[in-house]
Amino acid sequence: MSHHLDSPASRRDPRLNVTDVYAFDGDGATVLAMIVNSSLAGAGRIPGFHPEGRYEFRIHLDGAATGQLTFRFSFAPADAPGAQLVSVDRLAGTQAGDDRAAGTRVADGRTGEGFSGSGLRAWCGAAIDPFYLDLHHLAHVLEGLQNEQPIDNGEWAPAQAASTFAGSQICAIVLEIPHGDAELRPGRPIGVWAAAKLATDAGGWRQINRAGIPMMWPLFRALGGDDDSAEYQRDTTAGPDGDPANDTERVAAFVAAAVRRTGVSDPDGYGRAVAARLLPDVLPYRVGTTAAFSFAGFNGRALADNAPEVMYGLVTNSAVPTGLVAASAAETRQDKFPYVVPA
């Protein structure tokens, strides 16, 4: 859960909290995965997906600033056993960002079961969270960064690391788009982010939150401390196209402060370079290639990638071991569809 509970609305209903987004190559297809509704939200959590919500994969093509392709998932209320009917609509061109557009229905199914349509394959349901991180270590990292001090792990040591998310459950939306798709052909650069929206009383839709690059919200968005501020809500409810103008100065200054004490020759320049890499908050991926979310570069994100360690290293320009490796959470993923492990 690299995103955490970032907005008041998503804290009230974690079904609308997008915690992670993944993009990687599957069996002759591009795989997109969106994670919501962590069991770590605690008592009162309602299982499944919000029947008055929408869950969207937003895709930017060829480096475009705005999305030109959307896959929208909608869910019916749960039946007695707890399953929900699912519909998937495809919206392209100007419709991709239009909440009023209906798009084209491409698949219908049921949670907990794989389903297909129009060459696509999808799975939605409860699964084991593939994300791994020791939140005790994150607390030490954030304390050091926010106080502009070296990271002091205290009594914590990498050898003692244990994932806080081990055994926790989430709800996953997994979509396979074949390489033969006219828009997502191999070799094409794309950018991916996900959004959760809720119907309004006025008949429209309100974006509750969004996610793209992992760890952005705990490391950067929450720095102000006031998640009810106008700026914070702007980042939550708007798309990422405004991120460079809105957040570059703040992110660059934060990173520059983090590396200034490590001897980087040009802290301000490094901060600007990192901000340019992170903003807009859209996960880049080249279709048909092996995904790797790494310090050297972002190319999608595989379920096994150690995103926190990469982001810590990028922000500090130094190695910050989390004590966990991909094998630490091997039981939470599989090499075949639906790639997550159903719970």
Which residue stretches match the model-derived regions?
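Surface-exposed extracytoplasmic segments
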Residues: 1-343
